[in-house]
Amino acid sequence: MTTHHTPLYLISALALAVSQGVHAQDEQETKVQAKQGLETIVVTGVPRRTTIMASSSSVSSLSLEQVEVSTPRSTAEAFRIIPGVRAESTGGEGNANIAVRGLPVASGGAKFLQLQEDGLPVMQFGDVAFGNADIFMRLDNTVQTIESIRGGSASTSASNAPGGIINFISKNGENESGSVSTTVGLDYDSVRTDFEYGTYLTDSVRFHVGGFVRQGEGPRETGYTSNKGGQIKANLTKDFENGYVRLYYKHLDDKSVGYLPMPMYSNGDSIAGFDAQSDTPHSALFTKTVRLNGENQISSGDLRDGMNPKVDAVGFEAVFDLDNDWRIENRFRKSSISGNFNSLIPAEVGSASSIAQSIGGVGATLSNANTGEAFNDELAMRIHTFDVTLNDFGSIVNDFKLTKSFSDDTSLTFGYFASTQNIAMSWLWNSYLMELKGDNAALLNVTAADGTEYSENGLYAYGTPYWGNCCQRDYDTEYDTRAPYVAFSTKLGDVSIDASARYDSGEARGNYAGAVTSTVDMNRDGTISIPEQNVAGIDIANASPVNYDWSYSSYSVGANYQIDPSLATFARISKGGRANADRLLFGKVRSDGSVADEDAVDEVNQFEIGVKKRFDSFSVFATAFYAETEEQNFEATSQTFFDREYEAKGIEVESTYFMDAWDFRGNFTWTDAEIAKDALTPEVVGNTPRRQADLIYSLMARYSYDKGAAGVSFIGTTDAYAQDNNDLKFDGYTQVNAFVSYDLSENLNLALNVNNLFDTVGITEAEEGSVPENDIIRARTINGRTTSVTLKYAFN
C-alpha cells in the first residue's frame, strides 16, 4: 500500500545526481505503482470499503516499509509522516501530544483524534491525564498497515473523534509470512527482538502471532534500565463461504521512561552539565519514593517503572454477507488495563541559594543527600514526582453494523456503538531538590541557618506545596457511551455521495477526592521530621461525586466527483463533538456531581474541499480545510483551566512520485489558526494557539536495489509559540533520518538506521510562555542522534 505526499525538489535533485547507478525498472511497473496508491482499499472511518480515489474523505494508508524510512524510535514518531497530523513525540514511548488540522492541544494527549487497533478505540478518551491512548499501544511487526482519516467524516465513524482516526490494522495470516529480528543501539543502550508469523492451518483456518521484547536505557541517559518489557499479539480466523470470524488477544507489559520538560536555555542551548538532547533528570541515585497511596497507607513508588502499561485484551470480529444483499459486522473487545506513570518534572530551575532559602529561611544551605558534602553550585532544581498509579483503565467496546446494498453503488448502513471506559487512578506526588546535572544527579538536602534539617534524603515535602498541594488526587469514575448511527452512500453518474449521522449519549458516574494534610511518621522512626508534619494524602472522607450525562449529534455529508479516471474532486461539511471526561474534575464538576451542558461536550464544525490527481508516475491529494472548535480542558503541569473557542484554516497536501527504483513521498500541512474566544483569559483572543506552527512537513525518498534499500526522510516544522500569550517562540527545525539495508542472503537482511542524523535541536513544547530572568526554560526537545543496527531473518 502507498500514500501520497508533496513532491520534494531537494530530494529530486539528489535522485538525479545519483540516478546513474539506478537499476532501471520496467516503465509499466512504475505506472502500476503510481496507480496503486489512489486505488488502495481503505476500511477506516468509511461506511463501506472504498478506494482513496473514490472516497470523499481525506484518507491515507501506510505500510511498515513506508514507515521504516522515517526510522521511528517510538510509536508516536511514526505518526509524524501522516498528512495533517502534528505529533509531538518527545515524551518517549508514549505520552505524545497529537493534533490534527489545527484542532488544538490545549493540555495534552490527542483530544480530538482517536487511536484504534483493528477498528476499535484503544481508549475512549484520547487525552486522559497520564493515560494518553498511545501509552497503551505499540508499533511492531504484527501491524499490516496504518490507516488514517482526517477531517469531519470521522465525526460519525467513531465516538469522540471529530478530528480524525489513526487505526493500526493487524496482520491476520492471509498471506503466509514470518520474521524474527534483533535491533541493537550502537550509540545508546537498547536491545529489542521482534518476531511474527502467520499462515493457514487448514484451508479455512489461519492465524497470526507476534510481538517484541526489549531492554535498555533508551535514547537518553537515566542511569538505569528504563525500557524493559514487551508485547504479544495473536489472532485466529475461521473463514466461511460468506464471511469470517476472528478472535484476538493482546498482552502488553512494557516499562519505558516518560520524558517531561527539562531545563535548557530559551534558545535551545544546553546548560553546562545537562545536555538537552540526551540527558534527563532521572538518576540511579533517585529510584524510590515513599508516599501515602490512594487509601492513605504508607507505600513506595518506583521511578524505574516509568510509563508501565499492563494490558490484557481479548476480542472478536465477525463479518458475514447474508441473503438479499445484507451484510452484518460486529467487533468486540474487552481490555483490562492498569499500571503506573512515574516521572520527574522540574517545578523550578533557579538559584540554589534562593531555592534553599524558600524552604529553610534566610541563610539556609544545600548539601549532597548521599555524601553530606556542601553543595556550592549556582543552580539547582525543585523536582516534583509525577507518581500516578493507574488502578483501572479497563474498557468494554462493541461496534455493531448492518448494511443493505441496493446496488453496487448504493448502500444503507445502520450501526450501534457501545463502550464502558473506567478511569481510576491515584496521584501521589512528592517534592525533592536535585542538582542540575544530567549524569546521575544527586538529591540535595536543605538545612536552616540554625542547623535544623528541612528535608530527608532529598525530600522536602510529602506532596507539592510549591503548587498548592494540588496533586494528591484519587479518581474512581466510569464513563458509558452509546451511539446509534446511520450512513448512506450512492453514485449518480460520476458523482459519489455519502451522508451519515450519529447520536452520542453517555453518563459519567463515580467520585473523586483531593488532598488533605496530616502528621504522619512516614519512615516509622518514632520522631516527626519537618516534612512529616504536613503529609499530603487523599481526602477520602470528603470525596466528591461525579454524576453527569451528556449527548450530542454529529453529521457529515460529502461528495466525490470523478472527472476522469485520473482526476477527482470532493467536498465535505461536518459537525462533530467530543465528550469531556476526567479533565473536568477539580474545576467544572459541581458539588452535586453535575456538569453544565456546555462544559460536558465540545463541538467541532468542519468544512473541506479537495482534489486528487494521478499521472503515470506521480499522484497528488490536496485538501483545503476550515474548522471551528470548542475547548474545555485542564493541564496538570501549569494548573490551568481552559474555556475557549478556536478557528483554523489551512491546506493539506499529500503526494508520491516513482522514478525507476526511487520512491518519493512527502506531505505538508499549512495551518492558520487563532484563539477566537476565551472566557477565562480574554487577553489571548486573536493569538495563535500554542505550539501551532504555520507549516509542518514530512519528505521521504527510498531507493531499492538488487540487494536491499536505502532511504532518507526530512521531518520538520516552522517556528511556533511556546504558549498562548505568543511571546516566547521556538525556532523551526528539520530532522533528518536515514537508513540503508543489505541482503546478506536470500532471507537475511542487515539494516543501519540513524534517527536525527545531524543531531538537530528541535523544541516541541515548554512550560514558560516568556523568557525568564535567568533565561532558563523547561522544555521537551527531540532526542539527539541515535544509531541502531537490525539483523532480520524472514521465513516465508
For each predicted feature, which ranges?
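N-terminal periplasmic accessory domains that precede
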Residues: 75-78, 98-102, 113-116, 133-136, ...
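Short strand-turn segments of transmembrane beta-barrel domains in outer membranes
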Residues: 153, 165-200, 209-221, 713
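N-terminal Sec signal peptide and the immediately downstream disordered periplasmic leader
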Residues: 1-84, 646, 657, 677
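Gram-negative outer-membrane beta-barrel transporters
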Residues: 27, 492-494, 617-635, 641-725, ...
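Short acidic/polar hinge/loop motifs at secondary-structure boundaries
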Residues: 121-150
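Acidic/polar loop-and-plug regions of large Gram-negative outer-membrane beta-barrel proteins
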Residues: 226, 237-239, 244-315, 340-388, ...
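Extracytoplasmic beta-strand/coil segments of soluble accessory domains associated
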Residues: 29-30, 76-121
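Structural signature of Gram-negative outer-membrane beta-barrels, strongest in the C-terminal barrel
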Residues: 393-395, 405-421, 426-430, 434-440, ...
